[in-house]
């Protein structure tokens, strides 16, 4: 679909690029000739991903260990990248989410999502954007959001609020920074099964089963479809698209309203089982991080 050197000369940062959707997009950018930077809290994971991708596709992938909730750490990472030259594109992919009845949310649980998704995304966008403006350079920002930025969603309120903030940031900065040649858009994908999503958003479900049963197209999304849309948005083939949120979900949001409405029918036992599953996964992840 795309010329093999479409992104040659581009330097792209993908947040949360060590796993899942971020890793997939990073791989495609690398295949198309870009120099790719990936970041995440667990540098060892990013290091392993960088080695894997370069071994498979060649090119250059640089890994960075950073907690994007820390504005100073973010700025230091961006400054380090800039010492070799400016970025041309930013992919805001890092996120966190889990299902919960809102009355059972703790402030800590809310902050765990909001600090990554809302604060972290702004910190990275601000650190990159102000450098583009100072250097009089154009740039592209593509953020990964969700379809429920337009209508909200029960049981994922921290994510709905935080992703809606990215949606608002995208529209606001598209207007403010457009005169500098900086474009901002978001992709709102439906279900593309990943390990992290299945364990905290749909614990106990077979990956993709609920979406296949409800989606007008009868299937989940694919990594390739996300890759293609991300490449298109930064490729230069659509330079007048700015401030948009593009849904890619097989019309599921139009048909169903949201991904989690059916959880209204869950019993207390269902919620207890989900909470125990999420808690066990959190403990497993903490142990893996040491």
Can you describe what each PLM-predicted range is?
Residues 11, 16-20:
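Conserved glycine-rich cofactor-binding loop
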Residues 51, 179, 189-214, 256-290:
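A glycine/serine/threonine-rich, flexible loop-to-helix segment
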Residues 101-114, 211:
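Substrate-binding pocket helix/loop in short-chain dehydrogenase/reductase
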Residues 105, 152-161, 172, 197-200, ...:
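Active-site loop-to-helix junction immediately N-terminal to the catalytic Tyr of the SDR YXXXK motif
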Residues 125, 162, 170:
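Active-site helix of classical SDR
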Residues 178, 183, 241-243:
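Short, small/polar-rich loop/turn modules that mediate ligand/substrate recognition or access, typified
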Residues 186, 206-241, 248-250, 277-290:
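C-terminal helical subdomain
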């Amino acid at each position: 679909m795309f010329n093999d050197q479409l992104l040659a000369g581009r330097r792209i940062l993908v947040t949360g690029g060590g796993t899942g959707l971020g890793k997939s997009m990073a791989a495609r950018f690398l295949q198309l000739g870009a120099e790719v930077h990936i970041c995440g809290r667990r540098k060892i994971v990013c290091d392993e991903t960088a080695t894997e991708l370069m071994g498979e596709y060649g090119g250059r992938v640089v890994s960075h260990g950073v907690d994007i909730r820390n504005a100073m750490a973010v700025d230091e990472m961006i400054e380090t990248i800039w010492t070799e030259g400016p970025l041309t594109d930013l992919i805001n992919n890092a996120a966190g989410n889990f299902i919960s009845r809102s009355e059972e949310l703790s402030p800590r649980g809310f902050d765990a999502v909001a600090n990554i998704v809302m604060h972290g995304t702004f910190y990275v966008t601000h650190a990159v954007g102000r450098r583009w403006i100072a250097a009089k350079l154009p740039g592209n920002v593509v953020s990964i959001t969700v379809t429920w930025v337009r209508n909200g969603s029960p049981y994922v309120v921290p994510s709905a609020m935080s992703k809606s903030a990215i949606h608002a940031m995208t529209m606001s900065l598209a207007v403010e920074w457009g005169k500098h040649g900086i474009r901002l858009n978001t992709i709102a994908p439906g279900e593309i099964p990943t390990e992290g999503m299945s364990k905290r958003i749909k614990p106990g479900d077979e990956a993709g089963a609920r979406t296949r049963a409800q989606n007008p197209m009868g299937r989940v999304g694919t990594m390739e479809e996300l890759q293609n849309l991300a490449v298109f948005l930064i490729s230069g083939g659509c330079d007048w698209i700015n401030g948009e949120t593009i849904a890619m979900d097989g019309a599921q949001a139009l048909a169903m309203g949201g991904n989690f409405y059916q959880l209204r029918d869950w019993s207390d036992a269902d919620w207890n089982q989900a909470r125990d599953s999420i808690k066990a996964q959190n403990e497993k992840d903490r142990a893996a991080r040491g």
